[in-house]
Amino acid sequence: MSEKPFVDAPPPEDGVAHQVSPHDNGSLSEEANSINEYTGFGAHQEGEIRELARTFTNMSHDSGHDLSKTNTSQDLLKYLSHMSEVPGVEPFDPEQISEQLNPDSPNFNAKFWVKNMRKLFDSNPDYYKPSKLGLAYRNLRAYGVAADSDYQPTVSNGLWKMAVDYWHDMRKIDESRCFDILKTMDGYFKPGEVTVVLGRPGSGCSTLLKTIACNTYGFHIGEESQISYDGMTPDEIHKHHRGDVVYSAETDVHFPHLSVGDTLEFAAKLRTPQNRGEVSRLEHAKHMASVTMATYGLSHTRNTPVGNDFVRGVSGGERKRVSIAEVSLSGANIQCWDNATRGLDAATALEFIRALKTSAAILDATPLIAIYQCSQDAYDLFDNVIVLYEGYQIFFGKASEAKQFFLDMGYECPQRQTTADFLTSLTNPEERVVKPGFENKVPRTAKEFSDYWRNSSNYKVLTAGIDKYLAEVADGSQREAYRASHVAKQSDHTRPSSPYTVSFFMQTRYIIGRNFLRMKGDPSIVIFSIFGQGVMGLILSSVFYNLQPTTGSFYYRGAAMFFAVLFNAFASLLEIMSLFEARPIVEKHKKYALYRPSADALASIISELPVKLCMSTCFNFSFYFMVHFRRDPGRFFFYWLFCGLCTLCMSHMFRSLGAVSTSLAAAMTPATSVLLAMVIFTGFVIPIPSMLGWCRWIQYINPVSYVFESLMVNEFHGRKFECAQFVPSGGPYDQVAAVNRVCSTAGARPGEDFVDGTAYLQTSFEYVNAHKWRNLGIVVAYIVVFLGVYIALTEFNKGAMQKGEIALFLRGSLKKVRKQREQNEAKVNDVENNLPNEKISYSDAMEKDSGESSTSDDKLPNQRQIFHWKDLTYQVKIKAENRVILNHVDGWVKPGQITALMGASGAGKTTLLNCLSERLTTGTVTDGVRMVNGHGLDSSFQRSIGYVQQQDIHLATSTVREALTFSAYLRQPSHVSKKEKDEYVDYVIDLLEMGAYSDALVGVAGEGLNVEQRKRLTIGVELVAKPKLLLFLDEPTSGLDSQTAWSICKLMRKLANHGQAILCTIHQPSAILLQEFDRLLFLQKGGKTVYFGDLGKNCQGLIDYFEKHGAHPCPPDANPAEWMLEVVGAAPGSKAAQDYFEVWRNSEEYQEVQRELAYMENELGKLPVDEDPESRKKYATSLIKQYFIVTWRTFQQYWRSPGYIYSKFFLVITASLFNGFAFFHSGTSQQGLQNQMFSMFMFYMPLQTLIQQMLPYYVMQREIYEVREAPSRTFSWFAFIASQITTEIPFQVVLGTVAFFCWYYPVGLYQNATPTDTVHERGALMWLLVTAFYVYTISLGQMVVAFMEIADNAANMVNLMFIMCLNFCGVLATPEALPGFWIFMYRCNPFTYLIQAMLSTGLANTKIVCSSREILHFQPPSGQTCGQYMQQFISAAGGYLLDESATDQCDFCAMSQTNTFLDSVHAVYSERWRNFGIFIAFIAINMIGTIFFYWLARVPKSSKSKNH
């Protein structure tokens, strides 16, 4: 049971629960406070304890008292030490333990459970070996390289930038290109203490946490830095104890279709220790997962999918708690939490920090947490605080001493400002307040703050503590004890030096189980794949149905076997896409030391085996027997064995390509090149005798060629095939002697009426029976080699390095940005060096705002309409149950008022916003009305509102200004001039203080704009639209620091003062922030209203309501939001004294709300409705204007995505050149003609990959459109589809032109036009056909994905359609050979007309010259020359004799003109232009289909039953 029970964060286990650390400088009372102040959720004593703690905190803040010297502190310790006796038992059997230890019981007590585990560990320390881990660093410095010269590459400069970057990488790092992220700093952390890291975004908080967690990939640590983890170096920690020092990122990355319970149980299994007592691994893991879910309020979500921004699942706050629980289960001693409270409501955030405190105090964990918004109650829980300012450390010490340190420095803390906000505000020159008389004494710049700190007595205490710590760990005893504890946790067969808890094979087993659960959560891909293989087996086999055992089936038998091999080989190509979907999660779990990436690689292969078996069975059974291959059990199972091995081999190879690549586009391009090489050199397209010498080696290293050879031998060896066609034959030739004719098939001998299959293989392919089983060993060897390569690459490939949250600009704007930056720095220095005598504090900021007037403020819209709703009820169907999400919610939003929408995570806040704004996509609004001024909502409602979503969803390649301009141009009325829109965009940029990065690209999460900048942009996008009715904001302050959150609230107040109606959800409002709201709508679980009314001054209206209805009094210095959450039972672990939903429904306040709503409905409805047709339009701008603006943005996105465009060109150039030179100057023999025909077939191979490359970009843009732009009526779906179609066409035309030159001339098709002097005309037509093919490629992909939700399924559908097009185009099987049922496919197939046009244009009107292998030999009748004997046959069937006068042996070539060959495949030269026109029509059909299918599948249809 060495695993740290996780309530909260994986606590380090150490010796005695209440023991004071030997190197602790201070205070038994502080340690006691750590243990006691937070012992028990919801107990009666909780209030008394909190009051005592708050009293002590105030004493400390006011007078700097050392609590260890007060009797009161000792009394508190004594009081808490007499709490309920803890049993110290194993809590895994629910029938043998108390309800307080049972996580499935409503009476479960998380802190009691932790204490029980501590006592259990202490009862047998030699067995459990509890561990703890401290940390110290000295002269710590972190730096990055060359950010200032970095810029966003485009198609025009991407290659140059790539070359420059490569040159820099090859050289030693130039110090002039380095910039410091963290300046030199010192610190140390003792087990049992919780440390908070404070600083504004960009100050280095995340970098510090990453450095401590040894997660430094992407930046560098200075050589002078000294870091010690109880005597261990960062390198030792990373190699041997990675999972004991973890970093929890701000973003939440999980498998969206996996349930919460399965996600957490999986993490628990992989950290289940060996020394866990008598309980089984499974029971232990289930119990630990249940404990974390109960602790973090997730028990009710056990069977709910985690979800993500695009897959429906738990709420955003619940998803954040899942991330917290996962880290907790990882069992780390040192936990680095990066803004872990983002998205949590205030009470849940407080409980999370309490849980960390419990884990630290009782289990000796060492948590560090960076928080941007920290309440006073939360701050009081921390032992230490670090304050960072632009990378400088300006304080490190006791949290209770930090405030006084800066007060003594000469700064002033405004009234009602929390300590955390005060400390953070000191790093902002425009926020901090200087005491009178200290104006010229206080430090101003970040460096001055740092110098002041380093010269202080506090710093000397810190350095003394570091020296003492390093001296204590110098003997290595703590290191050895820690390693012994680590080894005791490890399962059997795990290396002691491994950072993992369970063995490799156990990891693999658990991951296999998880993978099956993922398939169960989203079975569509698996079902679609299996179904698709079965359908394709039936379709392909029907093309070659029931081949007869004659020589006429030789070509078709070979073609059928070739397709069977290819279909089995490349069935796994799309696995590359799923690899990249899972990679971020695998990398995260590697950092947590849950499992090796190689274990995930092996497990993914094993878990796919049943799927592959089903796919192989569905395809091969029907295919083998319908084609009428050899009906022999041994032959069939040999065929099935090789097909299965071929699938495995190629799966491993494609996975290896994916593992070595850093992006999907980078993986798919080489995969297609490899695929093309394998197809061409399988042995069918170009038989071995016809392969050119320079590329013959490709066949030797091609595993597919060995499979094809063995299967052909399996089918042909030892069989005699009746001759289907003799030369000469027909008429009088049927009566000639056998010696005077020969079968017209390779391997035939004169005088025989059959052809031996072995001879045919030897003559045509150079295949021999002796290789049949030899090839089995070769293929198995390839499987093993590729498997090893894949596992090794997965284990050691570091993946893509993140650039970090560093703004990237376009190359052309770098000079402007640098100049602006210099001006800003000068301005900042001016502000810092000329501090005014009076600074604006929180308390008077709004007074100043309201007092000053600005002409620019007149730009803000002024509204006068009221939005109100009544009895709003919404439910969704989950399995067989209708779950109510919103329960009869009432309310209104009036112009000039800000209404706060609050509630616990999962209470339905975002759902209510979506319901009010008509953005619901699932479920049913079963009751209620929504009105504007007493009238129902019209078609213009959605564009009349602004909706700031919780997720910051933007196009990564747009700049900030472009994103704002795009919204303004499309959403402001069309009568507003472009100049006015541009001016308003500039105004909003100034209003939101985005000028410094207005020309920066948005980037993706983690790279580009930081969280704060993204949130400002999200708000700005809605503001520039000038919403005339209402502004919704969903968590606008989530993830922001307190100062930025305050500025957002000031902005909302400014908007409200100009008549804007605002409804805003908010999770963690401080007391000061909450006062800026006018009204509050509070929801509890189930979407039930608990309160809707005025807040009043200092929130007194809210407090009076709840106190009037039985709530315990709100302390004067408490945060009303947190107090309210506890009162109504919305905080984890708290219970409401009564049902406040019923209290509300029975209150006088509720009756007043009903009367007000009735008045609005009756009286406002009498007001005239705006009849202006402009205001009632669904979209603000015309469709043609939407089209041009959206098309320009889409083109811009592609231009700024050089990786996508370059991968297209690289794929097309390599494929075309390879194809051209593999069939180099094929000549005009029969085999040469067939080679040229197959070269055209191979020319089509990039189609699938080009579409697969396009799909992620299309889906990404579609998600942005459907999640954000469509609901806000920015532009219509038709403009979106039309822009996607239009943007791709120019790129495809250029691709087609490049492909034409790289392929047409090497193959030598132009030579076929020389005899008729039509080189230019036929070359021009071939160029048109080639470019049309590339345009068709993208049009097909867009049509398929238009109605598909998942890119993988769209790719599968494209593969299915592509294969069907190739099979039914009349070349592999002529119309005469096709079953009658499939003739319609031949007629409706675009490739029929494309291949006929290309064949006739490329091959027509030239002579055939047979090679020696193609010459047929037979004797003429006695007394006749060959010319006399064959004259009648040649005139009827064609062909020519080498020597017409020969009398002993006739040498005959069966064809003399290419037109004869073309006639056999119905490629008529005179129809070439007609066929081209028909193919163009198919492109148009695809485009129309794209529009139709998108409308059919994805455009919401109006519902007559919708009740407004």
UniProtKB/Swiss-Prot annotation:
Pfam families linked to this entry: ABC2_membrane, ABC_tran, ABC_trans_N, PDR_CDR
PROSITE patterns registered for this protein in UniProt: ABC_TRANSPORTER_1, ABC_TRANSPORTER_2
Membrane topology, Cytoplasmic segments: 1-524, 581-608, 655-673, 797-1203, 1261-1288, 1348-1362, 1497-1508
Topology versus the membrane: Multi-pass membrane protein
ABC transporter domain: residues covered: 165-415, 867-1110
Catalytic activity: fluconazole(in) + ATP + H2O = fluconazole(out) + ADP + phosphate + H(+); itraconazole(in) + ATP + H2O = itraconazole(out) + ADP + phosphate + H(+); voriconazole(in) + ATP + H2O = voriconazole(out) + ADP + phosphate + H(+)
GO biological-process terms attached to the record: xenobiotic detoxification by transmembrane export across the plasma membrane
Induction behaviour: Overexpressed in azole-resistant stains. Fluconazole and farnesol modulate the expression. Expression is down-regulated by 6-shogaol, a dehydrated product of 6-gingerol extracted from ginger (Zingiber officinale).
Subcellular location: Cell membrane
Binding site for ATP: 903-910
Null allele phenotype: Leads to hypersusceptibility to antifungal agents such as fluconazole and posaconazole.
Regions crossing the membrane: 525-545, 560-580, 609-629, 634-654, 674-694, 776-796, 1204-1224, 1240-1260, 1289-1309, 1327-1347, 1363-1383, 1476-1496
Parts of the chain on the Extracellular side: 546-559, 630-633, 695-775, 1225-1239, 1310-1326, 1384-1475
Feature: compositional bias, Basic and acidic residues: 845-860
The keyword Phosphoprotein appears for this protein: no
One GO term describing the cellular component: plasma membrane
GO molecular-function terms, A-Z: ABC-type transporter activity; ATP binding; ATP hydrolysis activity
Activation and inhibition: The bis-benzodioxolylindolinone azoffluxin acts as an inhibitor of the transporter activity. Clorgyline analogs M19 and M25 inhibit the transcporter activity by uncoupling CDR1 ATPase activity from the active transport of substrates. Activity is also inhibited by beauvericin and oligomycin.
Predominant location category: membrane
Region (Disordered): 1-30, 839-860
Assigned keywords, A-Z: ATP-binding, Cell membrane, Membrane, Nucleotide-binding, Repeat, Transmembrane, Transmembrane helix, Transport
Function: Pleiotropic ABC efflux transporter that confers resistance to numerous chemicals including itraconazole, fluconazole, voriconazole and posaconazole.
Family affiliation: Belongs to the ABC transporter superfamily.
Comment field on protein domains: Contains 2 cytoplasmic nucleotide binding domains (NBDs). The N-terminal NBD has ATPase activity. The 2 NBDs are asymmetric and non-exchangeable and the drug efflux by CDR1 involves complex interactions between the two halves of the protein.
Protein name: Pleiotropic ABC efflux transporter of multiple drugs CDR1
Protein source organism: Candidozyma auris
Organism placement in taxonomy: Eukaryota, Fungi, Dikarya, Ascomycota, Saccharomycotina
